[in-house]
Amino acid sequence: MLMYSGEHAEEVEKDQAGTIRVVSGISDDHFLWKLCEGEEFMTPEVILAFTDNGLSELSLRFHRIIRENVCPKEFRDIKRQVLMNNWEGTYFDFDDDKIMDIADSAKEAGCEMLVLDDGWFGARYDDHAGLGDWVVNRNKLKKGMDAIADHVESLGMKFGLWFEPEMVNEDSDLYRAHPDWALTDPGRKPVMARDQLVLDMSRPEVIEYLYESISTVLRSAKISYIKWDFNRSLSNVFSRGLSADRQGEVAYRFVLGSYPAIQLYFRKKC
């Protein structure tokens, strides 16, 4: 098991003597690292396990390794709550009252958490605009995010909220202000998926923006859960924050930038 969240490759080879050789690591695609004199590069760790009791036992061993050594202890053993998510019930068409009505129904159904999905922020009335503008849409939620959270809490449930931090729409205030923050090839039409581009998570200023904007929302209401989405793969892997001879490092630096972005929300008080 490779301890890495980006593109990876595994090879298994058995030679004429019956010896099995396993190689696991970063994929050769989109990876070329310029290592200068005196610098170091650390490859991702690999976790190995062995059993002669079949795949089920091997899977259980990996589960135990991850639970006991990788999962943050403060979250590892907490009760996983039964939740209701509004997405397929409303898509982008909702307001305060509709979400509160759904919360009431969720309580009656025995749910323990309500998660407000995509569409609560920016000019987000469909999937063509607003992504990246992490500010509550007060035209939809006139009572504010805190009113919804308080209503859900009053029912004895927890409240969760949807984010997709790594993504941005061209039709957004963020992209209009910082088009260079998106991964795009100079001089080429960008490849879109779900009408969105991918932010360049290798850039510290992008991480700082995401932390500040999302933290402001999290501080505005009692939010107990984050649904962190990722609705497209990387393409046009080119960073305007790196020189031409270091573009092979972008995909790897993207992953390295994403890790602290996630940890900021759990290790620091918002």
Features from the language model and the residues they span:
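N-terminal accessory beta-strand-rich subdomains and adjacent acidic, glycine-rich linkers
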Residues: 1-66
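Active-site mouth loops of central-metabolism enzymes
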Residues: 22, 85-101, 193-209
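An acidic-aromatic substrate-binding cleft motif
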Residues: 61-113
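Flexible hinge/switch segments at interdomain interfaces of large molecular machines
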Residues: 73-78, 122-123, 183-190
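Core alpha/beta catalytic barrel or barrel-like domain that forms the active/cofactor pocket
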Residues: 76-81, 112-123, 162-165, 225-236
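Short, well-ordered coil/turn segments that N-cap beta-strands
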Residues: 78-82, 110-112, 153-159, 222-224, ...
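Aromatic- and glycine-enriched glycan-recognition loops and surfaces
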Residues: 90-176, 183, 208-209, 254-264
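Active-site neighborhood of glycoside hydrolase catalytic domains
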Residues: 137-154, 175-270
